[in-house]
């Protein structure tokens, strides 16, 4: 175990500020919340969740927070419950509200830091459910660097319709099938009414489950917790255990900076590749590493991608949901398999105070005969499904997810749109034909603002049967539920004057997953001419989106809002 063991006095390393005579007014306020003389002698531990009634991902988190409080009390500390915001991607998707999704990641991070810092807690548990909750919590945890544990609200159960498993993405794709004449409106309604049966994060290897898994692999969540379903007894137990664990971290003197090492991030990328995780993992892991002062770049993803096979037959490109993985051993069983075959660093410390290898000894192997995780000898794909592309269309990089995509190289004419809505209208009107390259720009971190996801558009293309025949490129993002021939995070973005701003309808575009190329057949001379003729629209400048647009970095840097120049602060 890393970290110096603390004495009882040291444990209250922040809340002891309330002890002096001059802090009598502060204590008066705290007494009104139920604290007594005895309680002032114990550590104050926060429990902060993104509870909200607007989404199944988060609707149960307040009750889970109460369980974390019980664990904290059992270890002799004083728990205090807080709330912060969430934006539900599935509800915001395809609407102007989607601009607030990625923005919310940094608001969540800032609000957790403000609440925990403003009240001098000694440690805290962060509980999240929807996509941006996880990286937002982790950015705060890394920035504060006090004992903390992240606890995931758990995955939703699959919906059932006509004896088959369905989920939210089934509804999105149903729209494309309806437009193509393959489903009636009533059939789509039946899918809609059965897709989401209760609480929990979206059920495939989408962004919420991807990031919860990555955090467990990093060592900042309890082993096994990321794959426990939202409504399971295991989930209730792991939340209570998280409360206990964070107080034990405090007693051990164990901090996030002891856990969030370069090797930890390498392992998180490794498991993300093996499970076929979301493209958003690139963005969020870069941001989390930045907060932890760990050097991580897009190129690191390609290095690991070339070595790690894709093993999981999970949605969106596979047939199983995350609950199925839980039933055959969960994330720990996958980690055991990868560790045994030399893919992970087993000697890293985790929030339990034990190493990765020591934690995994307590878990069973993958269930014999299971079909969710394929063997290394016969993987779903020989290398990882998340690929970083470069070329004259994305000099700073772009992210492609190629799981389930048979096409290795696509060359076609661009059809350029400056909004997702315009692109959707064109697809629904059958103006996009096989071979086309649909390009949606001015939707990056600054241009959106907020880098909205294109799940509505990508799902309609797949639903119309064009998933392998039409490429979709954007300086925006894709949902973890997206699959098909898609490339996002193109950097520099159009709003920053990136080459995508000067692409025109009819230009030939190449996407090649073998050479990792993304390029346009436009000469440097023609590009310079177009640049001189193009006026980039002004940055959005009102409210929170205006603040975000003016502060956010490139997607290639994780779209962080504190990317200061090293010479100004010393922080890279």
Curated annotation (Swiss-Prot):
Binding note for cofactor: Binds 1 [2Fe-2S] cluster per subunit. This cluster acts as a Lewis acid cofactor.
GO molecular function terms listed in the Swiss-Prot or TrEMBL record: 2 iron, 2 sulfur cluster binding; dihydroxy-acid dehydratase activity; magnesium ion binding
Keyword vocabulary terms for this entry: 2Fe-2S, Amino-acid biosynthesis, Branched-chain amino acid biosynthesis, Iron, Iron-sulfur, Lyase, Magnesium, Metal-binding
Pfam families listed in its UniProt record: ILV_EDD_C (PF24877), ILVD_EDD_N (PF00920)
Matches recorded under Gene3D superfamilies: IlvD/EDD C-terminal domain-like
Residues where Mg(2+) binds: 89, 131-132, 453
Coiled coil segments of this chain: none
Annotated EC: 4.2.1.9
Entry binding sites for [2Fe-2S] cluster: 57, 130, 202
Residues the record marks as active site: 479
Functional note: Functions in the biosynthesis of branched-chain amino acids. Catalyzes the dehydration of (2R,3R)-2,3-dihydroxy-3-methylpentanoate (2,3-dihydroxy-3-methylvalerate) into 2-oxo-3-methylpentanoate (2-oxo-3-methylvalerate) and of (2R)-2,3-dihydroxy-3-methylbutanoate (2,3-dihydroxyisovalerate) into 2-oxo-3-methylbutanoate (2-oxoisovalerate), the penultimate precursor to L-isoleucine and L-valine, respectively.
Subunit structure: Homodimer.
Protein name per Swiss-Prot or TrEMBL: Dihydroxy-acid dehydratase
Organism (species): Streptococcus sanguinis (strain SK36)
Record gene name: ilvD
